[in-house]
Curated annotation (Swiss-Prot):
Protein's job: Binds to the X-box motif of MHC class II genes and represses their expression. May play an important role in regulating the duration of an inflammatory response by limiting the period in which MHC class II molecules are induced by interferon-gamma. Together with PABPC1 or PABPC4, acts as a coactivator for TERT expression. Mediates E2-dependent ubiquitination.
Zn-finger segments (NF-X1-type): 447-465, 500-519, 561-580, 626-649, 688-707, 715-734, 826-848, 857-878
GO molecular function terms noted in the UniProt entry: DNA-binding transcription repressor activity, RNA polymerase II-specific; RNA polymerase II transcription regulatory region sequence-specific DNA binding; ubiquitin protein ligase activity; zinc ion binding
Gene3D superfamilies from the UniProt entry: R3H-like domain
Subcellular location: Nucleus
Transmembrane segments: none
Predominant subcellular localization, coarse grouping: nucleus
Name of the molecule in the record: Transcriptional repressor NF-X1
Keywords tagged on the record: DNA-binding, Metal-binding, Nucleus, Phosphoprotein, Repeat, Repressor, Transcription, Transcription regulation, Transferase, Ubl conjugation pathway, Zinc, Zinc-finger
Organism per entry: Mus musculus
Amino acid sequence: MAEAPPVSGTFKFNTDAAEFIPQERKTSGLNCGTQRRLDSSRIGRRNYSSSPPCHLPRHIPYEDISAVHQHSYASGSKPKSPQGFFQSSNKSLKNHGLQNQPWQKARNEKHQNRNKKAQGLSEQTSDTSSLESVARSESGTNPREHSPSESEKEVVIADPRGAKPKKAAQLTYNYGRGPKAKGRLRSEWGNRMSPKSEDENTRPVAISHTDSSDASCRKPVVDPCVCRRNEQRRYPQKRPPWEVEGARPRPGRNPPKQESQRHINAGPKTNMSPIPKDNLRERPTKSACDTGNLAVVSKSSRRVNQEKTAVRRQDPQVLSPFPRGKQNHMLKNVETHTGSLIEQLTTEKYECMVCCELVQVTAPVWSCQSCFHVFHLNCIKKWARSPASHADGQSGWRCPACQNVSAHVPNTYTCFCGKVKNPEWSRNEIPHSCGEVCRKKQPGQDCPHSCNLLCHPGPCPPCPAFTTKTCECGRTRHTVRCGQPVSVHCSNACENILNCGQHHCAELCHGGQCQPCRIILNQVCYCGSTSRDVLCGTDVGKSDGFGDFSCLKICGKDLKCGSHTCSQVCHPQPCQPCPRLPHLVRYCPCGQTPLSQLLEHGSNARKTCMDPVPSCGKVCGKPLACGSSDFIHTCEKLCHEGDCGPCSRTSVISCRCSFRTKELPCTSLKSEDATFMCDKRCNKKRLCGRHKCNEICCVDKEHKCPLICGRKLRCGLHRCEEPCHRGNCQTCWQASFDELTCHCGASVIYPPVPCGTRPPECTQTCARIHECDHPVYHSCHSEEKCPPCTFLTQKWCMGKHELRSNIPCHLVDISCGLPCSAMLPCGMHKCQRLCHKGECLVDEACKQPCTTPRGDCGHPCMAPCHPSLPCPVTACKAKVELQCECGRRKEMVICSEASGTYQRIVAISMASKITDMQLGDSVEISKLITKKEVQQARLQCDEECAALERRKRLAEAFDITDDSDPFNVRSSASKFSDSLKDDARKDLKFVSDVEKEMETLVEAVNKGKNNKKSHCFPPMNRDHRRIIHDLAQVYGLESISYDSEPKRNVVVTAVRGKSVCPPTTLTSVIERETQTRPPPPIPHHRHQADKAPGSSTLQKIVKEAVIDYFDVQD
């Protein structure tokens, strides 16, 4: 049996095999309208039903498919005309769209011929098992029945995870049948029988080949009842799926017993029941090609197929081959994106995301090729040109739904597949589609096929074709869905050679490179002094036959000369020859002179490696290890063998951070380090940003902080134990495994409880013991103290002055706000503080002023309180009012200053009684001044007092009283305020103009017939408006301001009987006040003294001459 070459992820199709690209070979006899309606009904079923897989035998390559189909037609079964084909296709419109292709039609007719020939064979042969074995030996394909109803229900689902397909039967529910196994190889069905039963039940049967073209298509057909009985004998534990416990009953079906009876009467059909899983695992695997030949059908797919089959049987209107009415009656699966779009666009229920309006079937639209949302063409144009659609940092505009960036703004209304511009709407087609085949390629998939659906919205469905892929190890081939990017794995071992080149990979079939070899080997170094255990494949190709690696030690093996050992690092064999051999040494030890020149000068020739090398006698000059890059030290000895001696110079070395340098003898460099540490401290900040480095002679590039953070975490209980870091500390990782409850225990947080978690909130009433017995209104809480009680009560104030109401219970000390007025311990004063708590005076004496009246003036003492002591003698600080004789002048004077005449009175009294003092008599001066004399003290009158006195005399002379006002001075002066006068002085001309306007307005209203008359002043500033308002009050006018700044103006209104002009204008008053005043008259003191005989002693004392008290006359 010839097999097709393995194909790994690629497709091989014959250009003549049009069956795998549907719609390419159409029936030529159909017109365009008929064919379009056929495609429309076919595309609806293809969208929302399982795609029929292309089941092919594994021994037939894709290139020979067309040849198989060409020879599969039997005589008399070929369609005679296109109309006949059209009629036959109408009978099976519920099948998949691929059924209507010529190759599918020929395939169905081939099986009908096969059934007829099998019936003839069944008459000649009585043993059905023999026929079955002969059919297996004749062909490697599985005996399958492809009726129009079965082709639709074939489903093959590849493993989406890329694993090896399991050896399970492909189960689908057929009309009137139980579970049916499809797609099995003949060799696999043969494996189901044990060798013993196969020998017993199989015998050769001669089959005559009447037609060479049908030789490859002859397959025996056996009675299904006989097959079922034979299978029950071989597998007694097998039950139909509807009898399995927990199996889902088939909708719309009769009990299995009645169905089987009805199918037995219907006629013979080939039906192979599936193999149970237990038997399937026990069946041995004979070839690698049989392992992945079948796909597994999931339970969900079987359930969906059952429901779809039930829907097709119950609703015959859905299976109508031609769309009738306004809407397209195709079977749509609303669970898919495409089906939902078709339904919403057809019923005009789809909304444009830009304008939120419904998309009409006749409106131009645009569909996004990324998310497949549909928009109005005009709406998407406006959106693309708006600033909100521009992508940040990219050129183009964003889709409103998926934010996919597009470069070009759509300007043309096209169908969904993009082939037709401005498609016309037809009630028999999907709105906004062209009605032709989509033909779009699957983006991003390795699939050469194009979409064979009619022009549709939404994404194209997966490719329904199948291909053969080779597994990752290349030993088996599997049939998978075309375009799926899954990798195929088998259950065999990989067996590829590992990196070591000796062992094979023992893992199951996998992708990518194999893992390194895991076998541990013991290797020895080249010199044999060290060994190690490594993985197999380490240092492959470095072995010298004795060792496998270098230990980096001195080799130490004896050289061929026998006198020296190898001084090289451990290396592969063999060792280099002795470097001191005569034929290898050509220069003197310092390397400056060739040995040939030294031999000419009489040096002895070397014969062995042990002979010394002749010296040239020059300075050695080899560079030493000391010195610097600028000045290299050299050996100062004469040409010699061996190592150079120590250097006698000094070298400059730098500290570790290169901040300081110092000189050291070269001889001490070997014993000491070439670097030293300076005392400079690093001032850079550490990575934490909180601390400084402070390391001595620091050379770190990243200054890591070695301290522990130590900051408190959010829980408030623990501290951060991580190294000092930037930013916020992490959350506390501590957790409690005890239940966290509220105070009353009603609410619980079960462990683990993160550290810092607050107790749960509880809605129960607080159950704690409270200080008062008032009702509790607050909930259970975790705080230690309960909220204050807010129950309103009556409480006395702290000073017991009054009983206050509506006081919350938690308030203890209440002040009424009144003075305390409690008697102080001094017994003279009362507490002046507001109502307070506790004693009035705490550790202090009363400091209120003493109220005891003085003996001289009667004013209080005003000294700090002294209850047990007499009042101290101090000057009285009380203020008294003094007046002049006329009463015009009044001043407040301190009482002690008013009695300043005490000294003068004492001097006068002593002068008068000086004789008595000379005689030794005492003089009492306390009686010289009394309270009456102090109260009679007066101030001196000034010039204004004299002018007032003169006016008073003139008034008396002209008989002018205070009530009369002949010059109208009081009335004019009282009408103009001081502020108005001050404002008028700033702009006297403006005031004069305003007064003229007001006088004219008042005269006009008094003389005219109207009771009111108004005048509008032009716009002006605030100060001028204020002057107008003040003058209007003087003239009795009404003034109102209108408009807003800077056009605000004033309108004055005169009212008859109310508005009167003042007797004196403001302008004349200001001019009179600004004129120069004449000097005041000179007062006449003699006349004043005569008029005032009762003047005070103070005035007399001031006017008297100075008395010379020491001018004593005998």
